Each structure stands twice: as structure tokens, then as C-alpha cells.
Amino acid sequence: MLHWNPAQYLKFGGERTQVVRDLVHRLSERLDNEQVRRIMDLGSGPGNSTAVLAEAWPQAEITGLDASPTMLEAARAAYPHLRFLAGDIPTWAASATALYDLVFSNSTLQWVPGHTELLPRLLQRVAPGGALGFQIPGNGSAAACRLPRELAALPAWREYFGPGKVTERWTGQMTDFYDLLAPHAAAVEIWETEYFMVVAGVEAIVEWYMGSGLPQYLNALPDDAARARFREQYREGLRAAYPVRRDGRVLFPFKRQFVIARPAAG
């Protein structure tokens, strides 16, 4: 199961927050910014996305929602002037009655099941003239993301990864977003951007995924020795997939998928 470490996640805080800024910039071009009064940030994590939203729309009442106690603690400590609530996204989507000028989510919905019901419900929480805007990683087939799954399926490791041990990411297509939202929307924008991070070596890629999906694989293993072996095999796979460049550094490409949906009138 997923376990979130805010300090580990924020080792790459600049890179993780850049995608928030890019989506917020696009949203600011689409919205009547003076009319943005209420914002919900779903999966607010350590608060970095909520802080960017507050910079863009300082007049708005902004709430961050997250299910991780450690992430909420970090967010409240870093941004005491902002409001953060404990809760999970499907429950909020099914029970919320208020409307928001912006329902926002950064790099979270890939971990949330039931997109067929969830995405239309999120759009229903958007006020007229507002938007649903979210981003998720689009790198599920990239080696760094694929290798833990492949290792877990090997005979040497298979016994440790039974049902419920690992939270699977959403594996649909970008076209699914359009098909799920378009019947309920006045307009849907979808796009993908590939970011190339320059890192010192593959250990930086290991550290990146230690801030997201890799710990759940390591936590499923019986002892530190097994965890060290799994991590080293992961590292070996990364070395083959991400070669060292002429200057001694490594390029780490990372695709991000973006969606903006505007509610239909009436």
C-alpha cells in the first residue's frame, strides 16, 4: 500500500511543482480570474500545489484535501495560513454539495479507482464559468515506472506481492478522459508534455520514485536484506534504460498528462 513521506517527496519539490505552475498558467488563461472565489485542491500532498493556487488567486478561499496524515501534517506546518482537510477523493466527490470555481488535482487521480464515476462527479462540483483541471503522470510504460512491476512478477519476488500489497495506478488512455468528460462538459482540453530532467545518475531516479510508488514494493518485502536486493535490481534495470550522457549525467524523461474541462451550461 502507498505510504507518503513528505521530506522524500520534496527532495524534487521544484520539479514536482513546475507541472503545477504549468497547469495553473493554462487555467489562468481560460478563467475569469477575478471571479475565482472558491478552489478545491484534491490530493494536496505537502501543500506545494495549494500554495501555487494561492499565489495565482490570492482572493480565493482555497481548501486542500488529502488522505495522508503525514502529508497533511507537513502541509499545515509549511502553510499555516491555508486550509487543509483530511479525506479521500471518492468520498468527497460523492458527498460534497458546494460548487467551486476550480476543482484542481495534481498527480493524484492516477491512484484513485473508479474514473468512470469519479470524473463526471468532479465536474459536477464546478460552478458555471469554472473549470476542472488536473494532471497525472503519463509515464506508466517508462522503465522507471515499469521495472518494479516486472521485478515483482519474477519467481524470486512473486510470493511477496499478493492481492492488496501494491496500489495499482490507473492505466487508461488520454482519450478516456475525453470520453468520460465530454458528455457533461462545454469544452475539454487534453494535452501531454514530456519533461526531461537532468540528474546526476540513476540513483536520483531511485530517489524520485522513493517519493511516490517505490516504497510500497519495498514495504511488502520481509526484511532489509530483501529490500536491498530488490532496490539493487531496480537500480540495475535503470542503468540499462537510462544511459550516461557524454557529460556524465543522465536524462530522465517524464511525461505528464493534463486535462481542463469546463461544465456545460445549465
Language model regions located:
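A short acidic, Gly/Pro-enriched loop at the edge of an enzyme's catalytic core
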Residues: A94-V103
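Conserved Class I S-adenosyl-L-methionine
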Residues: P46-N48, E168-G266
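Conserved alpha-helix/loop element of class I SAM-dependent methyltransferases that forms part
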Residues: E15-Q35
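Class I SAM-dependent methyltransferase Rossmann-like catalytic core
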Residues: L2-T17
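Conserved catalytic/acceptor-binding region of the Class I
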Residues: T116, L123, A131-A200, A220-L221
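Helix-to-beta-strand junctions that scaffold the AdoMet/dcAdoMet cofactor pocket
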Residues: V112-P113, V126-P128
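A short SAM/SAH-binding and catalytic strip from SAM-dependent methyltransferases
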Residues: L102-H115, G138
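Class I SAM-dependent methyltransferase SAM/SAH-binding core
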Residues: R38-A93
